[in-house]
């Protein structure tokens, strides 16, 4: 587990660098949008916006026969709702960098949300006349099946972390050194259901063993208290 300040700072720094790279592939006016929302969105949210908008403007470049670098903000006023709906339909089967790709309803909904956020920003700042993106219905999302491990599967994973049957020589010595750590991390991960990104951002100071609780940093930066059972506590105690 990493020092949480270093982990999140480095992650945000890397994410912001990637956003700057993607801005080079977007129309010049998109920089105003990204700088304008920087104080009320996370870096990961902005990165997703950048990826989605790159696909959107690449599509418009092909359809309108206008290089992305020559697009002006007036283009957003020229587009009709049907133009964005055609883009969503295009996402069912499209190419990016020579690769064939396809978006399901959830992917289309995310890209529409990115387009809406951009339109909303420029409309609220009186930089465009209309917000046509707000007129488009969100693609219907089908309920996503949640796949869970049963008790036996969880036990098998934890037993595998402790077993040295698959190792020999130097690998076994290395495994023996990290066995307790791996078991503790997997116990916490499987016992609480936190995300991997939340797990790697934890620090020893985040844990309160008197109350079997810990503080996790959620998506968006919110801090939440979660609880673990005695089995997880014992595994963490053995390691820490």
Give short role names for the model-derived ranges.
Residues 1-240:
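Conserved catalytic core of the tyrosine transesterase superfamily
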